[in-house]
Regions:
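C-terminal domain-boundary segment and adjacent tail
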Residues: 113, 206-236
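Active-site rim beta-loop-alpha module in soluble metabolic enzymes
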Residues: 121-182
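Charged helix-capping and loop-helix junction motifs
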Residues: 95-103
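Catalytic beta/alpha-barrel core
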Residues: 7-12, 91-92, 110-121
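Acidic (Asp/Glu)-rich catalytic clusters
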Residues: 22-34, 73-76, 107
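Glycine-rich tight-turn/loop motif centered on a GG-T
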Residues: 5-12, 43-58, 92-93, 151-163, ...
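Conserved, mostly hydrophobic/aromatic
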Residues: 36, 82, 197
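Glycine/small-residue-rich loop that forms an oxyanion/phosphate-binding "nest" at active or ligand-binding sites
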Residues: 42-84, 91
Length: 236
């Protein structure tokens, strides 16, 4: 039910054996693999903010994505994209200096750089900088999280998992109108090229199946994204 997987690279979760096993599984099922670098915080699952300099963000991103890239190369696969995790995502959204350091590392690792970030991507410092550096920025939509009135993600998930009936309605609305409803029932316009769901959700498999069925019913074909070349922040 998925085309692409974000893989933790050892800092907030994961380890060498898990990375190798997961890459093999992804290859077996034809799933593209992207790096999911985070902060060096296993106990906090990378969700606690840390004070890092731009050079530390650059080095940490290079280290994690480089490790996964090597595992992929050993299995005749390529790194598909990079997507920051947890508190690192929030830090890059707020800081242009950290965002530039992250983007610089991505360019040096990826032959055709793509970063995945929550829509609307113009809300984030790192995505604005990355686009200007020629990185393909992929806006993502979420159905296991809620949105505020300006399209920001509310980073809290229901313990019981996503409401599947509500997911069907939200997906249908987005496909028809290009809008999602905020927690206050305000319509928010969105542009997205990918739909993200969290694999640790209690009903993640059912959620993936629900989304896939909805997309298939609307005649969408699911496949890993192909990078869109950019020049000075614009599609080539």
């Amino acid at each position: 039910h998925i085309t692409t997987a974000n893989m933790a690279c050892g800092f907030h979760a994961g380890d060498p054996m898990t990375m190798v096993k997961t890459v093999r599984l992804a290859k077996q099922h034809g799933v593209a693999v992207g790096a999911h670098p985070g902060l060096a915080d296993l106990l906090g699952f990378g969700r606690r903010t840390m004070a890092l300099s731009p050079e530390e963000v650059y080095a940490d991103t290079l280290y994690q994505t480089g490790a996964l890239s090597a595992v992929l190369k050993a299995h005749d696969m390529e790194l598909h994209h990079v997507k920051p995790h947890g508190a690192l995502y929030s830090m890059l959204s707020a800081s242009e200096a950290l965002g530039e350091a992250f983007a610089r590392a991505v360019i040096e690792i990826c032959p055709e750089p793509m970063i995945y970030y929550p829509a609307p991507v113009e809300n984030h410092a790192v995505t604005r900088i990355a686009a200007d550096m020629g990185i393909d920025v992929v806006p993502e939509l979420y159905f296991d999280l809620s949105y505020d009135d300006v399209g920001g993600l509310i980073l809290k998930r229901a313990n019981e998992g996503a409401d599947l009936a509500d997911t069907k309605l939200r997906l249908a609305r987005f496909l028809e109108s290009g809008e999602v409803l905020s927690v206050n029932d305000k319509p928010v316009a969105m542009t997205a090229r990918s739909i993200c769901l969290h694999g640790d959700g209690p009903n993640a498999v059912d959620l993936a199946r629900t989304i896939c069925d909805g997309l298939a019913a609307a005649d969408y074909t699911l496949a890993p994204l192909v990078p869109t070349p950019t020049i000075a922040g614009k599609a080539a």
